[in-house]
Structures are given as structure tokens and as C-alpha cells.
């Protein structure tokens, strides 16, 4: 799917004001001509500290936590860090939480790269450093050479004058408004380009409004509404000029773990999201490397795990499903998440993938809390779902994931199943698919997106692994489905002919490659002393399957398609034969379109499906034409 960024808890304000009044008693005069002493009054006010003055001079809303506190006062955001948080590794990320026009931003979109920061005290300022994570120092080599560290120094990115210290705790208080409330190129909310158009945007600072402040155990969230004026320009003109849009933005600040996960070196034969690193060797030299992005899985009983017993992880991967989903969708979503457990069981882990509803009666649960990975429902007309995640920039450890499911993804399901399977599946011969088709197809979509959150990229070679004629075999398709991996854009069995009774029409509940990818990414090895030892074992695993098309990884090609065996929306190892079968089926579907789609469904729906048939036909033509100048690329 496409991937393509964005409760108040009031705390008692600190107020200390004590007035002491002392009246000096005067004695009454004995005689009227006596000199009367004037009555005097002495007022003594306890002097406030700079910290107290900063938080009491204006009406202040505060949220306090163990690692950070925020105070909103007079249109400013004050940040308070205790001593133990200074110098700690943290990340900052941005999520779009609302938008006035869905065409101007994707609700739930996260910036793809977290910014790794530290706050340190320098003289009379707090400096936010952007940490240089290009250099990786292995655990068995804790001290890097001075020369190496000097070549990978941190960047002093923002400086905040200290307003005060908390005398009782030693915490430092500073004004972070210049960073949080202003536009920043490291945290772009508005994309610079949309298709062939250049986007120009200007933030109206005076209209920015803080909407929420939340602090949790190890992360915090600052929400705000930002107002932009947007213009689009391109070679064909300017379709949008000075268009106002309001975008809700959540800034997340979270602590990174003190103990680093053991990273895993990449292999071009397994498709995973990557990060580039310079690895410091014992002799002081630098090796170029790429680490994969994955969750940290540790068995509760390591001895039992290496003895071959199924073990639960110390920290399972749990997804919380928003309660606004229709009941049918929730069933499919939960099932799709759990598909991956079968693959984890093969490598010794059980109950890794878990799923639950948003807790209704748990006051501690909050979807804005970074520690919860959530599946969110977006009631917009976007026909899509996506699975972004955030990772520790030091090691590639996935630390938070979100699956976004847009309402109109069901339209895509209706169209796919009609043009690809109506020739053989009577259930698909209608304007709208029945619940059974919606449910089984949505399961696949969710499992695909969960695969992305587990670290897996698209594998566009997987569908070409299956022999075309085998896609007409009930026995073969019941075992293998339509593809070797659900991370392909393989879709549904358009090769199956109307008389191929018993043929499976859907992708498998995990393909051969998916089981292999889980093993490669998450299997643990006894006696391993680090990522280099793991890499030796993993190379042997990949070598074992070298040359087997079911285990082949094909990188998704953007722009020009060079490799005809690694393209989207195709099935089978013979594109000419597969497309010929597909064209035969489209003729049959087109012939029956008026019969299957009644007048009660409306002419618009009939016209829409007619266009979908034409679009599918063009897919078949393209799948063949790519072979003419094509070359096969092997990772």
C-alpha cells in the first residue's frame, strides 16, 4: 500500500504567597494634650524565587512528569528538565493529528526520520544537540578513539536561555517556544513537492494555538494547531494560490533506552528497511554498514528457547485497535495482525503478535502515549492503508508503530475483487462485495501493513516465483496462494479461469518468503557475541536458499521498470500467458457487466467498474511490454 505526516491534564500551579501583618499596639493618652504616637504597620512579603515568578506571574497550565514537564503560559511553552534528563538520549517526532482539508495532508502521517537529540546545560543556556548517530561503536568496544569521536561530533541546534532553576529539585526551566511553536526545516509539516508541483507554504505564527500538553512515564506530547497559506506551482501553472489550511500537529519527545539492542547487518537478499552506519573497528578504522529495522525480541527463558522450546518474549508486540472501526473491520484487523504469529512460532517464539481494543476503562491508556502502537481509523475518502513506524536511530530498533486504515479502502477491495475474480467467484459479481469478501481481503491488507511495521519492504519478485499454470491448480494454490510473499502487490488470482473450480483466489496467510524473512530478521543464535557473529549465521541461511525463486527478493522499482519479474500487480512466471488468461477473464466480465450490475446500483457505479476493467487490461499490457527492453536484476 502507499505510504505516503501530522485530556488536557491540569496540574495545580505552584503558588506560594505569604503575607505577615504585625500591628504595633499603642497606649491611650492620659491627658488630652499628650503627644499621640502614630499607629504603624509593618508588612513583610516572602520573596519569590525566579522559578516561582516564572510560573505564577501569568496564568499557567502545567503537566509534570518524571523526565520532563511542560508549562503553557502567556502564549509560550516552558520546558522543565530534571537533572537526570540532561544529557539523556531522546527522540523528537511529528505526527499530523488533524487537517482542515484532507487533500492537504494525511491524517496520522509521521515524519519518516526521527531526530535524535540531547539537552545539555552550557553556561546560562540549555542547548539542544542533534546527536550524530552515523558512528556505531560495538558493545565489546565501548571506548572510541578520540579522533573518531571528533569526526562525528554532535550539532548544537538550538539554544534556550535558562529562565530559572527549581531550587528544590535542581531542574532547569527554559522557554522552548522558539523551537516548538515555529516552523522548522527538520520537522516539515507541509511537503515541499506534490507530484510535479512545488509547494510553497508560510506559517502564520500569530495563529498557532497549543491544544494539548501530555506527559507520560518516558514520553511527552505537545499538540497544536498551525495555520498555513499554501500555493502550488508547476510547469502547467498554479492550481492553488494562497489557500488557507489548518493542520493539527503532535510533537512527541521520548526517552531512548539506555541499553542498546544488538543491531543486525543487512543482506541484499532480504528486503528490509535500512539505516546506514559507520562502524568503528578495534584498530580504529571505519567500516561502512547498513543495519535493518526490527523489533527487539528477547525470550523470557533463554535456556528453554535455545533448547528448542516455544517461549514468549519479555515484551510482545501489541497493537491497540481504535474502537471507531465497524465490527466487521475490527475482526479482520485483529486476524490480520495475528497472521504473523505462525512465522514467529517457527523460530521459537509464541504470542509475539498481540492485539486488543482501545481500553474503555483504563485511565492510563492514551493513544498519544508513545509506548502504545495503535491501529487508527481515518474516515476520509482516501483508498489506502499504511504502516509507518519509528525506530531508534542508533540501532534500528522499532520502538513505535502505527497502522492507518482509511475508510475508502473498502472501495479498492470492491474494485479489485470484481475485475480480478468475478469470472470465477459468484460472490464478487456485484456492485459491492459481501461481508465475507470484505473480511478476507481486509485481513490481507492489514497483514501486509503489519509486515511493514515489522521491518519488511515490498518484495516485488514474489508473485513471479509461482508457475503461471500452477495458479489454475486447486492443490497448488491451496498450499501457496497467489504469491510467495504477502509483501508483494500480487493481489488476487486473475489467472484462474471460470472452470477452475476449487482454486484459491487470494494470497496465502504468509508465503514461503514471509516465513524466511521472519527467520532472518528475528531468529536468535546461541553463543553469539554480537552482530558480526549473527551475520555469519544469517549469510549461511540466505546461501541455503540461493537460486530458489520462492526465496528471491526483488526491490520495488520506482519510475522506470527495468526488471519485468519485479513489478506491481502481476502474477506468475510467464507474463504473456498470465496476461492472456487475464484478458480472457476481462472479456467475460465485460460481457456480463450489465447483467451483474443492475440498474438499482446506478450508472455511476457501472461506469466506474467499466473503467476499472480498462485499467486492469492496461496492467496486463504493461506486464508484457516491460519484458521487451527488460533485464533481470538479482540482489
Where do the model's predicted regions map?
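Conserved catalytic/binding loops enriched for acidic/polar residues
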Residues: 463-635
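Sec-exported extracytoplasmic/periplasmic mature domains
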Residues: 338-349, 451-452, 456, 492, ...
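Bacterial Sec-dependent N-terminal signal peptides
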Residues: 1-35
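Solvent-exposed, polar/charged alpha-helical surfaces in well-ordered, non-transmembrane soluble domains
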Residues: 331-338, 342, 444, 615
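The catalytic-center signature of Zn2+-dependent metalloproteases
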Residues: 357-378, 440-497
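Active-site neighborhood of thiol-dependent amide/isopeptide-bond enzymes
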Residues: 325-329, 333, 435-439, 467
Amino acid at each position: 500500500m502507499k505510504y505516503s505526516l501530522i485530556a488536557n491534564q491540569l496540574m495545580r500551579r505552584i503558588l506560594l504567597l505569604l503575607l505577615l501583618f504585625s500591628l504595633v499596639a499603642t497606649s491611650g493618652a492620659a491627658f488630652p494634650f499628650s503627644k499621640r504616637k502614630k499607629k504603624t504597620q509593618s508588612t513583610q512579603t516572602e520573596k519569590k524565587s525566579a522559578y516561582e515568578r516564572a510560573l505564577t506571574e501569568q496564568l499557567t497550565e502545567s503537566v509534570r512528569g518524571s523526565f520532563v514537564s511542560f508549562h503553557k503560559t502567556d502564549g509560550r511553552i516552558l520546558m522543565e528538565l530534571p537533572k537526570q534528563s540532561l544529557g539523556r538520549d531522546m527522540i523528537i517526532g511529528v505526527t499530523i493529528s488533524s487537517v482542515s482539508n484532507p487533500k492537504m495532508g494525511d491524517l496520522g502521517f509521521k515524519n519518516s526520520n526521527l531526530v535524535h537529540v540531547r539537552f545539555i546545560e552550557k553556561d546560562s543556556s540549555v542547548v539542544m544537540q542533534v546527536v550524530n548517530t552515523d558512528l556505531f561503536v560495538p558493545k565489546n568496544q565501548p571506548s572510541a578513539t578520540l579522533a573518531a569521536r571528533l569526526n562525528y561530533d554532535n550539532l548544537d541546534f538550538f539554544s534556550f536561555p535558562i529562565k530559572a532553576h527549581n531550587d528544590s529539585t535542581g531542574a532547569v526551566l527554559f522557554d522552548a517556544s522558539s523551537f516548538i511553536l515555529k516552523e522548522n526545516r527538520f520537522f516539515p509539516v507541509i511537503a515541499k513537492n506534490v507530484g510535479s508541483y512545488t509547494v510553497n507554504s508560510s506559517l502564520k505564527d500569530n495563529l498557532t494555538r497549543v491544544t494539548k500538553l501530555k506527559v507520560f512515564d518516558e514520553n511527552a506530547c505537545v499538540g497544536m494547531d498551525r495555520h498555513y497559506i499554501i500555493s502550488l506551482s508547476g510547469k502547467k501553472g498554479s492550481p492553488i494560490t494562497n489557500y488557507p489550511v489548518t493542520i493539527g500537529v503532535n510533537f512527541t519527545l521520548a526517552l531512548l533506552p539506555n541499553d542498546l539492542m544488538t543491531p543486525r547487518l543487512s543482506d541484499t537478499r532480504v528486503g528490509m528497511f535500512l539505516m546506514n552506519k559507520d562502524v568503528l573497528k578495534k584498530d580504529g578504522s571505519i567500516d561502512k554498514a547498513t543495519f535493518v529495522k526490527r523489533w527487539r525480541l528477547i525470550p523470557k527463558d533463554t535456556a528453554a528457547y535455545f533448547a528448542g522450546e516455544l517461549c514468549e518474549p519479555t515484551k510482545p508486540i501489541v497493537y491497540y485497535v481504535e474502537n471507531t472501526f465497524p465490527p466487521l473491520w475490527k475482526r479482520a484487523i485483529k486476524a490480520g495482525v495475528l497472521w504473523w504469529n505462525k512465522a514467529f512460532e517457527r523460530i521459537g517464539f509464541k504470542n509475539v503478535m498481540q492485539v486488543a481494543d482501545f481500553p474503555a476503562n483504563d485511565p492510563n491508556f492514551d493513544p498519544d502515549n508513545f509506548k502504545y502502537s495503535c491501529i487508527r481509523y481515518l474516515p476520509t475518502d482516501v483508498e489506502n492503508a499504511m504502516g509507518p513506524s519509528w525506530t531508534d536511530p542508533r540501532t534500528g530498533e522499532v520502538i513505535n508503530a502505527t497502522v492507518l486504515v482509511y475508510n475508502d479502502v473498502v472501495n479498492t477491495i470492491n474494485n479489485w475483487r470484481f475485475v480480478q475474480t468475478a469470472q470465477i467467484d459468484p460472490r464478487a459479481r456485484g456492485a459491492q462485495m459481501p461481508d465475507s469478501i470484505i473480511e478476507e481481503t481486509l485481513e490481507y491488507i492489514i497483514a501486509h501493513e503489519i509486515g511493514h511495521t515489522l521491518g519488511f519492504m515490498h518484495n516485488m519478485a514474489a508473485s513471479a516465483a509461482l508457475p503461471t499454470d500452477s495458479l489454475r491448480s486447486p492443490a497448488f494454490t491451496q498450499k501457496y496462494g497467489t504469491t510467495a510473499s504477502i509483501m508483494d502487490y500480487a493481489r488476487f488470482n486473475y489467472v484462474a479461469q471460470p472452470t477452475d473450480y476449487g482454486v484459491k483466489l487470494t494470497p496465502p496467510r504468509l508465503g514461503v518468503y514471509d516465513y524466511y524473512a521472519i527467520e532472518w530478521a528475528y531468529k536468535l543464535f546461541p553463543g553469539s557475541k554480537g552482530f558480526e557473529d549473527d551475520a555469519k549465521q544469517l549469510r549461511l541461511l540466505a546461501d541455503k536458499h540461493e537460486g530458489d525463486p520462492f526465496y528471491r527478493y526483488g526491490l520495488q522499482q520506482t519510475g522506470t521498470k527495468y526488471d519485468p519479474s519485479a513489478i506491481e500487480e502481476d502474477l506468475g512466471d510467464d507474463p504473456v500467458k498470465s496476461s492472456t488468461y487475464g484478458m480472457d477473464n476481462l472479456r467475460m466480465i465485460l460481457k456480463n457487466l450489465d447483467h451483474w450490475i443492475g440498474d438499482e446500483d446506478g450508472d455511476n457505479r457501472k461506469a466506474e467498474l467499466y473503467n476499472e476493467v480498462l485499467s486492469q487490461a492496461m496492467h496486463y499490457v504493461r506486464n508484457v511490454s516491460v519484458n521487451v527492453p527488460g533485464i533481470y536484476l538479482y540482489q
